Amino acid sequence: MNNGYYRFPTIHDETIVFVSEDDLWSVPRQGGVARRLTSNLGEVNYPALSPDGEWLAFVGREEGMPEVYLMAAAGGSARRMTYLNHSCQVLGWTPDSTQILFSTNTGHFHPQEYAIYTISGEANGGQVMPVPVGPA
């Protein structure tokens, strides 16, 4: 991948993950061959590596509207974490790598109004919880 359009980089230690060709790719920080992490998830965006480097949260459009997905940072199957049917963007993680932070316009009258939420990074995802701050 010498030429291309690389978007939304996220870095943890010696690993860089980025979006290109509507998929997630991983490459060592010092350079080398990029490895495709996703395929068949529709358009993907906004990746965020967890602070411990074990997990990768991102937004995928496999079934239409963007939703939050989670996969091991090394690659493998992705799990859909939200079922909001509204626009969303992964913002990052809590420092302990247990909660994914994301913004969404679900439940808002104006589609441009977003709020910040968390969802557990565990297998079942858990409940979407609002972060007690103003609109994003």
Model features per residue range: what roles?
Residues 1-2, 51, 84, 95, ...:
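Intrinsic-disorder/low-complexity regions
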Residues 1-29, 45-47:
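Beta-strand-rich domains and repeat architectures in extracellular enzymes and scaffolds
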Residues 8-13, 47-55, 91-99:
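Blade-terminus and WD-like Trp-Asp/Gly-His loop motifs, strongest in beta-propeller folds
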Residues 12, 33, 52, 77, ...:
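Cysteine-rich, disulfide-stabilized extracellular repeat modules
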Residues 19-25, 39-44, 59-69, 77, ...:
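A flexible loop/linker signature enriched in serine peptidases of the S9 family
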